[in-house]
Amino acid sequence: MESLYHQTNNVVKDIERDFQRLSQLSAQESLDVENGIQLKITQANANCDRLDVLLYKVPPSQRQSSKLRVDQLKYDLRHLQTSLQTARERRQRRMQEISEREQLLNHRFTANSAQPEETRLQLDYELQHHTQLGNAHRGVDDMIASGSGILESLISQRMTLGGAHKRIQAIGSTLGLSNHTMKLIERRLVEDRRIFIGGVVVTLLIIALIIYFLVL
């Protein structure tokens, strides 16, 4: 199990390096890297399924800590899958904007010799307006995607906290921890839950304000 865990963890780190490369590539060059990332995510998820089976072969005294490590891998992979989807949508928008811009430019150059100055100025204005509108839409989409990623991250953390609470209770019963120690641990979990709820509320408010002011 240890060998497969470290192998999967290395795949996750490799995917993170691919994302760093992705931010430096053009829209056309990004496609191959995105496909490579998807293959690695699929492979890592398959490894996690195997790790879930191997957990039952781990000694009971080590099973809880091993499960926590596997759960962390799953959480990282969910986050990477969301990031990949966001990157794909961003690339598609960039390619669409490039295509529309080229169409406007070609239309402008075709009409340049035959149309009067007023028409050329109108085409220049339309091109500038289209560029500004595309930038605004891309900014809104990026903010919404970023907010969605944050919300998904918070939800995943909430699920992780809930699972951790149950595992801590099980470990406490096994190890015979005192009631005072268990109460301290539960108090910390309650504080983490309040932080989670506050984070969700603040994130939703920020997204709502951004959309409101951009629409005005």
Swiss-Prot record:
<dbReference type="GO" id="GO:0015031">
    <property type="term" value="P:protein transport"/>
</dbReference>
<dbReference type="InterPro" id="IPR038407">
    <property type="entry name" value="v-SNARE_N_sf"/>
</dbReference>
<dbReference type="GO" id="GO:0005789">
    <property type="term" value="C:endoplasmic reticulum membrane"/>
</dbReference>
<feature type="topological domain" description="Cytoplasmic">
    <location>
        <begin position="1"/>
        <end position="194"/>
    </location>
</feature>
<feature type="coiled-coil region">
    <location>
        <begin position="62"/>
        <end position="103"/>
    </location>
</feature>
<dbReference type="GO" id="GO:0035149">
    <property type="term" value="P:lumen formation, open tracheal system"/>
</dbReference>
<keyword id="KW-0472">Membrane</keyword>
<comment type="similarity">
    <text>Belongs to the GOSR2 family.</text>
</comment>
<comment type="subunit">
    <text>Part of a unique SNARE complex.</text>
</comment>
<dbReference type="GO" id="GO:0031201">
    <property type="term" value="C:SNARE complex"/>
</dbReference>
<dbReference type="GO" id="GO:0005794">
    <property type="term" value="C:Golgi apparatus"/>
</dbReference>
<keyword id="KW-0653">Protein transport</keyword>
<keyword id="KW-0812">Transmembrane</keyword>
<dbReference type="GO" id="GO:0031902">
    <property type="term" value="C:late endosome membrane"/>
</dbReference>
<dbReference type="GO" id="GO:0000139">
    <property type="term" value="C:Golgi membrane"/>
</dbReference>
<dbReference type="GO" id="GO:0012507">
    <property type="term" value="C:ER to Golgi transport vesicle membrane"/>
</dbReference>
<feature type="transmembrane region" description="Helical; Anchor for type IV membrane protein">
    <location>
        <begin position="195"/>
        <end position="215"/>
    </location>
</feature>
<dbReference type="GO" id="GO:0016192">
    <property type="term" value="P:vesicle-mediated transport"/>
</dbReference>
<dbReference type="GO" id="GO:0000149">
    <property type="term" value="F:SNARE binding"/>
</dbReference>
<keyword id="KW-0175">Coiled coil</keyword>
<dbReference type="Pfam" id="PF12352">
    <property type="entry name" value="V-SNARE_C"/>
</dbReference>
<dbReference type="GO" id="GO:0006906">
    <property type="term" value="P:vesicle fusion"/>
</dbReference>
<keyword id="KW-1133">Transmembrane helix</keyword>
<feature type="topological domain" description="Vesicular">
    <location>
        <position position="216"/>
    </location>
</feature>
<comment type="function">
    <text>Involved in transport of proteins from the cis/medial-Golgi to the trans-Golgi network.</text>
</comment>
<keyword id="KW-0256">Endoplasmic reticulum</keyword>
<keyword id="KW-0333">Golgi apparatus</keyword>
<dbReference type="GO" id="GO:0005484">
    <property type="term" value="F:SNAP receptor activity"/>
</dbReference>
<keyword id="KW-0813">Transport</keyword>
<dbReference type="InterPro" id="IPR027027">
    <property type="entry name" value="GOSR2/Membrin/Bos1"/>
</dbReference>
<protein>
    <recommendedName>
        <fullName>Probable Golgi SNAP receptor complex member 2</fullName>
    </recommendedName>
</protein>
